[in-house]
Amino acid sequence: MNPEQNDQRAPNIRNVCFYSFNFQDALSHLRLVGPANHLGLKVIYGVENGQVFPDRAQMGDVIVLQRDFPRAFEAYQAIQKIAKSKQIPLVLDIDDLLFELPDDHPDRLQHNFSATLLPTFLAMLEADLITVTTHALRDYVIDFNKNVVVLANYLDDLLWQPKTPLLTPQPDSKIKIGYMGGHTHQPDLTLILPVIAQLSQQFAGRLEFHFWGTQPPEGLSGRQDVHWHKEVTWNYHDFAINFQAQSADIFMAPLTDNLFNRCKSSIKYLEYSALGVPGVYSRLEPYNSVIKHGVNGLLASNDEEWRDCLVSLIENPELRQSIATNATADLSSNWLLSEHASLWLSAYQEARETMTSKIDADLKMSTMLRNISQQIVAMDRFTKDQLKQKSDRIIELEHQVAQHEATIEGITSSRTWKLALLFRRMREAISPPKR
C-alpha cells in the first residue's frame, strides 16, 4: 500500500466486518479481501472455522455479507439487529443470480442453495446497499432495493502479473486449447462438445485439449488428446500462482444462453488474458461489453461460429498473438484492481449515506419473510440432522457386519471347525442321511 492509497480512505471507513464462510476462495478475494488489501482497510472476519460471531459486527465501520451468508439465519438476524441499533451500514454483495439457477445447473440439481434463497431475498430487501458484479445483475436486483452499486470484478495485480503474448507454438508442436472452471460449468462445456469432436478429427494429431478444474465432458474423458488438470485449488491465492504456471495457445469460455449466465462477470476473460493467451467467448453479455470481436477476443454463438473462430486461431499464429496482445493491453489499461479499488471505498461511503435515507422494507412483508425463512432454515437443518443420523447408523451397522464377518471367518478357518467338518463328512459316509 502506498501513501496515496492510504489518503483515499474516507474518514469513517477504516474497518470492514466481513461475513463469509470461505475467506480464501475466489469469491471473497475478488469481492472484498483483494480491494481491502489495496486500500489498506482492516478486514474483521466474522466467521472462524465455520463458527459465526455476530458480535464482531459492531467492530466494523461497515458490515459486508457475502451473497448466501444469510443461510445462517439466526446469525444474520443478530447482525442485522446490531447494524440497525449501532447505525452501521449493512451491505449485501451478490455476484451470481442464484434466484435464477437454470434447471440443469449442478447447484440447482443438488439443491445447494435452495434453503438460502428466501433468507438471501430478505437480506436483499433489508440491506442498506447491495453491491453486484454486472449491470445485468443490477437491473434484476434494483426492483427489490433501489440502493445498488456495480463493483465489477477486476484482476488483482498483487497476485497476477500479465504475461507478454508469444508467437507460439513451433511448426511441429501441438496446439493446446484450454478451458478453466469449476464443476458447475459442465452444461456450458457440453455446448461445444460437438465442435471439439470435429476439430479433433479435422486436425488429428495436431491438437491437445486441456481442462483445468472441471472434468472434461462425458465423451472426451480417456482420449489421448484430452488432459484433465483436476488439482486446481479453491484457495484463490494458490490458484493464481498455479494457473499462471500453465500454458496454452487458445482458451475457450462457452456459456449457455440463460438469464443466470447473462448476469455473470467477465472474470475468465481477465484471467485468460493475464496468461497472454487469446480466447473464444460466448456471444453473451458477460463478454459482449468487454470484447471487440477480432480485436481482443473472438465471439461465437453457435456451433458453426465456434468452429470457425477456433479454426482461425489454430491456423493463424499471427492472429493469436495479435488478439492476445490487444487483450493484455486492455487488461493493463482497464481491468487492474490497483486502479479501481477506490470504487469499493466510494460504495461503502455511499452505504453510510443511503442508510439514513433508506425506506425500510414493508414491515408486514419483512415479518412474513422472516417467519418463512426461519421455517425453511429449520427444515433444512432438521433434514440434514436426519440424514446424518441415518448415515451414522449405516456406518454403525456396517461396522457390526464387518465384526460378524470377521468372527465367522475366524470360526471357519479354525482347526476346531475344520475337524468338525471332517467328522460330519465321515458320519455322512458311514450313515448317509435318509432321503
What are these regions (language model features)?
Residues 18-39, 154-246:
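Conserved catalytic-core segment of nucleotide-activated headgroup transferases in glycan assembly
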Residues 126-163:
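Donor nucleotide-sugar binding/catalytic pocket of nucleotide-sugar-dependent glycosyltransferases
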Residues 353-435:
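Boundary detector for helix-to-coil junctions that initiate low-complexity/charged tails
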Residues 1-70:
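N-terminal pre-catalytic "stem/leader" segment of glycosyltransferase-like enzymes
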Residues 291-304, 312-318:
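Conserved acidic donor-binding segment of nucleotide-sugar-dependent glycosyltransferases
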Residues 187, 233-271, 280-289:
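Nucleotide-sugar-dependent
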